[in-house]
């Protein structure tokens, strides 16, 4: 929370603060965020690499304008920024352009769910697979261990079977 409070600008990967889940979560523990300058910028969830690259470049250039003015910029994201996160696209560009950038870890949703349920995702030699479900996933149904399907809103119902 100290880092959020130290920012001159908070980037929200959404059309509006009302639609930003990360903003709503942070607002519960840091109500002063509602008085901070915000930049709402939706990140497209598309597979067309050229369009995605153009969108990320446009978003980064907007953020870099603030950095050039000497502002401290933070970006909210849900889960952990290192796991299929929109933040990493900006982080890489900032580092490539000589800016100081820091990744502040969070709690991935699948870890939070396992903790809430009181279960382990993997023990001893059990494998844990994290799979981007927005792509082809059929081959992964035979993986041993625990499979975590991220970004799964578009895969519909998957066949589940209990392993013995």
What are these model-predicted stretches?
Residues 12, 37-42, 103, 123, ...:
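Structural signal for conserved beta-strand scaffold positions within catalytic alpha/beta enzyme cores
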Residues 79-143:
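Class I SAM-dependent methyltransferase SAM-binding "motif I" and its flanking Rossmann-like core
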Residues 2-6, 68-69, 124, 140-144:
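Flexible, charged surface loops at secondary-structure boundaries
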Residues 140-163:
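A contiguous loop/helix-start segment that scaffolds small-molecule binding in enzyme catalytic cores
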Residues 3-97:
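Class I S-adenosyl-L-methionine
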Residues 71-75, 101, 145-150:
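Generic beta-sheet signal
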Residues 16-17, 134-136, 151-155:
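Short beta->alpha connector loops
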Residues 51-60, 116-119, 142-146:
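Short, surface-exposed amphipathic charged segments that create phosphate/polyanion-binding patches used
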């Amino acid at each position: 929370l100290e880092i959020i409070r130290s920012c001159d600008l908070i980037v929200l990967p959404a059309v509006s603060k009302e639609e930003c889940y990360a903003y709503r979560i942070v607002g519960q523990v840091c109500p002063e965020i509602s008085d901070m300058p915000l930049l709402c910028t939706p990140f497209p969830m598309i597979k067309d690499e050229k369009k995605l690259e153009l969108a990320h470049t446009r978003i980064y250039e907007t953020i870099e304008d603030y950095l050039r003015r000497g502002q401290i910029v933070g970006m909210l994201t849900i889960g952990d920024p290192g796991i299929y996160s929109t933040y990493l696209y900006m982080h890489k560009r900032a580092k490539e352009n000589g800016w100081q950038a820091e990744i502040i870890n969070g709690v991935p949703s699948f870890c939070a769910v396992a903790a809430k349920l009181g279960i382990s995702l993997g023990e001893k030699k059990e494998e844990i697979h994290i799979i981007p479900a927005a792509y082809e996933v059929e081959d992964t149904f035979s993986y041993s261990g625990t499979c975590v399907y991220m970004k799964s809103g578009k895969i519909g119902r998957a066949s589940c079977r209990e392993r013995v």
